[in-house]
Amino acid sequence: MIAVGIDVASKKHDYFMIQSETGLTFRRSSVTIENNESGYKKLHEDIQAFSGATGDSDIRIGLESTGIYHTNIIAFLITHDYEVMMINPILTNMARKSGKVHSQKNDNLDSQVICKYLIDNSDELTPYTPILYHR
């Protein structure tokens, strides 16, 4: 499985990718993109490149629910048929504090913490489904 952890913010997002079986990472540290369509396209291109390089098409994306800042990127990812998992930030914070993942907190490490949490708990997480309102 390719796990993608995204740390969501108002103006930018940081993401980290790892192939869970081999431990191969896309980059040594997180990649930063702007919170706009061109940033989302870069993320999509990087995911596709990493998937092609590893031969792994099982892609799961995890991000924390943070106000409204995740709304547009989730819509983009779902439109491109990615499996997106919304993770409660309290759970990733608890994992960080328990010592199972990095104990520091910064944007670069946050995406790695989310990625690790996604790998460790992938069987318990369910994909995000948009809320549909009917009249």
Residue map of PLM features:
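Phosphate- and other anionic-substrate recognition elements at nucleic-acid/protein interfaces
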Residues: 1-135
